[in-house]
């Protein structure tokens, strides 16, 4: 039997054409998740060595404080993991050693022995304000120092609720819940991409768990988690959204929920909404993209309403905290001042500051036009496009940190860990499902 266009029905080339958009035959294409055997000692020993070298150099070059505490613990953890993987050829032991010494040990040490960094303090305070006043932001008259500002969107307060409800010590610290959320979300992302997820494949569950542990144990995520930076859960939610839209055309709603949660927490997630929507328009049609965008926006709106019910009474506080403060347009400036092009231009004076903001806006318009004129065709292309967009944003922003580049690095790492086997010859990030009655299409 053949279709009207002459392609055999049921063949990998068959596609549903709606409004000119060509949709893949999702029954025959699935995301490739790294198999459990690919995470063996032979592949991970060099990575542990690279991680150890990075942590050692970071310990020497860092200015001290929480960063150096993490670097010293992490160096020991990665060296131990590399030695254990090389000597005993195990997977679980070295991974758990790296996670324990690069994340758990320095995090607990910093919680019990060292002062918290600004991020956990801000999140915990916002949760207390939410419970007391229904608004996680201080009013303009109370913004006496830069520490008084809250540059996060309202839903970020959920990580501070344990502290606000009276938990103290490790269980009440924001860093514990940021790390737990990141591990769970990354495991869900890898599990969502497993090729035999629907069949309850034990190997897929194992691969998803160990892939998540390896990702979290890498310096890209473990350093910000240990010192209390809020970016890793946003990265994990973005990876989960990519896994959903790669897995099936029926999952953009789930992807929309994931991106919606991230967008309700931090503005750095907003570009992901635009990039994924553009990819869905090109791949699946405008209707699927509209469902994804609607799910994202509704989720964001609901979460903001729930986590900041008093916000409508003081909208100026929201603008002061999440718009003007990150752009350096308030009386007290953010300490995010890494010597990148945007900050260097902004530091030349008021004219330079306005020029930096204008250049950032021009870059945003340019990326938007690029998405419309040449949208990404698949998930790997979308991940790369998002990495480029975020890199431009962090380079050109008037207030920025080197640590923000964890976003593009993590996205490229996610794309690499879920890439297609080159031997399949299929689209990047996809591989043909096995069919005993028909050879794979090259």
Residue map of PLM features:
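Primarily membrane-embedded glycan-assembly and transfer machineries that use lipid-linked glycans
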Residues: 2-242, 280-405, 415-421
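Metal-dependent active-site segment of extracytoplasmic phospho-/sulfohydrolases and closely related
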Residues: 242, 253, 260
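Membrane-interface junctions at the ends of membrane-embedded or membrane-associated helices
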Residues: 88, 245-255, 280-290, 416-442
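The feature captures the transmembrane alpha-helix scaffold of multi-pass secondary transporters
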Residues: 237, 253-257, 273, 388
